């Protein structure tokens, strides 16, 4: 019986290693490396330390990207690699609807801290707004959802992130009923997640070698 159990787990371990070794280096680094895990945790830890020192009032907020900043979509990358496919909006939409993304390392502790301090979070993501309910479902499954969070997802191709950030600064567009906010921190995995004009808040950028505009 013992030999059977050992053999069974050996087969599982071998299969995992074999499939893992077939992944592109960028995806394998995110999925398996201690460096990726450590970096993400360090970024969230540093942000926690910094925000403890910041005065927070009703006008304060942080702007966060979602994918590869809060939500870990490496499983999507694994699946399209196994199929010999590359990114497409069709497969990506199906993945988002599944609401199966995991958390970026360190995110849960950071969100617990944010909730205790009652800091307003505004999510500005290029996920399409038509899939907001699936995104919320995913956040709930990960136990980081809060009904006070604001989601400014993409309405159409012209609805760039800088446009939505400007709505936050000026209290216009979808922020009209809420009012303007003072941003004390930005979180993202690409340069487009950060403001060039209103850079008073600290910026925290996460490693994402899997995709981007380079």
Question: Predicted segments — roles?
Answer:
Residues 55-62, 121-126, 151, 176-179:
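Surface-exposed patches in mature extracellular/periplasmic domains of secreted proteins
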Residues 52, 56, 76, 112-120, ...:
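Sec-exported extracytoplasmic/periplasmic mature domains
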Residues 67-75, 193-195:
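Short acidic, Gly/Ser-rich segments with clustered Asp/Glu that frequently serve as metal-coordination loops
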Residues 2-5, 16-64:
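Non-catalytic pre-domain segments flanking phosphatase-related domains
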Residues 71-72, 77-105:
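Metal-dependent phosphoesterase signature
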Residues 94-122, 129-130:
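Short, acidic loop-to-helix structural element flanking the phosphoryl-transfer center
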Residues 62-70, 129-131:
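Acidic helix-start/capping segments at beta-turn-to-alpha-helix junctions
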Residues 25, 31-34, 38, 128-214:
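C-terminal cap/substrate-recognition subdomain and adjoining C-terminal extension
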């Amino acid at each position: 019986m013992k030999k059977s159990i050992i053999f069974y787990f050996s087969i599982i371990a071998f299969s995992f290693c074999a499939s893992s070794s077939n992944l592109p280096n960028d995806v394998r680094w995110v999925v398996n490396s201690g460096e990726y895990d450590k970096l993400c945790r360090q970024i969230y830890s540093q942000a926690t330390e910094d925000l403890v020192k910041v005065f927070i009032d009703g006008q304060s907020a942080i702007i966060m990207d979602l994918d590869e900043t809060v939500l870990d979509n490496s499983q999507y990358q694994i699946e399209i690699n196994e199929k010999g496919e590359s990114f497409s909006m069709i497969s990506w939409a199906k993945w988002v609807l599944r609401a199966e993304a995991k958390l970026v390392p360190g995110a849960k502790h950071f969100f617990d801290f944010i909730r205790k301090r009652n800091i307003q979070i505004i999510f500005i993501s290029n996920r399409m707004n038509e899939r907001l309910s699936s995104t919320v479902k995913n956040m709930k499954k990960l136990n980081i959802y809060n009904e006070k969070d604001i989601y400014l997802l993409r309405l159409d191709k012209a609805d760039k992130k800088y446009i939505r950030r400007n709505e936050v600064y000026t209290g216009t567009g979808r922020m009209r009923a809420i009012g303007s906010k003072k941003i004390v921190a930005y979180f993202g995995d690409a340069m487009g997640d950060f403001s060039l004009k209103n850079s008073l808040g600290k910026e925290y950028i996460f490693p994402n070698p899997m995709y981007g505009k380079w």
